[in-house]
Amino acid sequence: MAGGDNNSQTTNGGSGHEQRAMEEGRKQEEFAADGQGCGLAFSVPFIQKIIAEIFGTYFLIFAGCGAVTINQSKNGQITFPGVAIVWGLAVMVMVYAVGHISGAHFNPAVTLAFATCRRFPWRQVPAYAAAQMLGATLAAGTLRLMFGGRHEHFPGTLPAGSDVQSLVLEFIITFYLMFVISGVATDNRAIGELAGLAVGATILLNVLIAGPISGASMNPARSLGPAMIGGEYRSIWVYIVGPVAGAVAGAWAYNIIRFTNKPLREITKSGSFLKSMNRMNSST
C-alpha cells in the first residue's frame, strides 16, 4: 500500500509539473504574440502589424503625394482644397482598413509619442518606424516612375517662408493632431468607431491651415520618403524636429487631462440623460 501511495504521489507530482510547464508555455506564447518577446524572434502577429504599417503608409503617401503631383502637373485641376480633402480621406480610410491590426500609426512621430506615454512598447518603435519609412519611400518611388522622374513635380515638403516659421507651424499642427489621436484612440471614454473620421478631419484642417506655409507634413516619413527619392533635403530637419516634438507634447498634454480610466457611463451615472436611458433599458 505504501508503494502504491508513493507511485500515485509521483504521478500526481509529474502531472502538476506538466500543467505548470504548459501554463508557462502558454504565457510565453501570449507574450510573444503581443510582440513583447526579446531578441529578433518576431511573432506572426507582430509581422502582420509591420506589414499593415507598410501598406497603410504606402497608400497614404501614394494618395496624398499623388494628389500633390497631379495638381502640379495639371495646372491646379485638383485645387488646393481638393488636395487637403484627399489627404484627409486617405488617412480616414486607412485607419478603418488596418487600425484594428497595427493601430494605424503611419507616422514615426505618432509611434514615438505613444511610446513616451507608455502606450506603445519601446522595443517595437524601430520596426514600426522602419516600416513607415519603407512604405513612404516606396510610394514616392512609385510616383517618381509614373511621372517620368521629373524634378519639377516634387511631392515633398518645403518651407514657403523661413525655417523657423515652418518649424513652429509643424509643431502646432502635429500637437493638434496627436492631441486628437490620443483622445479618440486611447481614451476608453471616447467613441472609438469615430476615430478614423476625427483623425481624417484633423488632417484635412491642418493641411488647409499649414499647407501653403510649411506643406503640412506632420509626419517625418511623409517628408523623408519623397526627399530621398527626389534628392531634395533642403530644410528637412524642420520636418523631423517639428512633428516629433509636437507629437510628444500633444500626447503628454492629453495624458495630463486624462484623469481617469473609467468609462464615461461610470463617470456620469448621475447624469439625467444616462439615468433616463437606464430606465428605458430596464423597462424594456
Curated annotation (Swiss-Prot):
Name recorded for this polypeptide: Aquaporin NIP1-1
PROSITE patterns: MIP
Entry's transmembrane regions: 50-70, 78-98, 129-149, 166-186, 194-214, 236-256
Keyword Zinc: no
Inducing factors: By abscisic acid (ABA).
Pfam families from the UniProt entry: MIP
Motif (NPA 1): 107-109
Biased composition (Polar residues): 1-12
UniProt entry keywords in alphabetical sequence: Membrane, Repeat, Transmembrane, Transmembrane helix, Transport
GO (cellular component) term, any one: membrane
Organism: Oryza sativa subsp. japonica
Compartment list: Membrane
Topology in membrane: Multi-pass membrane protein
Domain notes for this protein: Aquaporins contain two tandem repeats each containing three membrane-spanning domains and a pore-forming loop with the signature motif Asn-Pro-Ala (NPA).
Motif (NPA 2): 219-221
Function: Aquaporins facilitate the transport of water and small neutral solutes across cell membranes.
Single GO MF descriptor: channel activity
Keyword GTP-binding on entry: no
InterPro entries, alphabetized: Aquaporin-like, Aquaporin_transptr, MIP, MIP_CS
Similarity section: Belongs to the MIP/aquaporin (TC 1.A.8) family. NIP (TC 1.A.8.12) subfamily.
Region (Disordered): 1-28
Tissue specificity: Expressed in leaves and at lower levels in roots and anthers.
Compositional bias per record (Basic and acidic residues), positions renumbered to this chain: 17-28
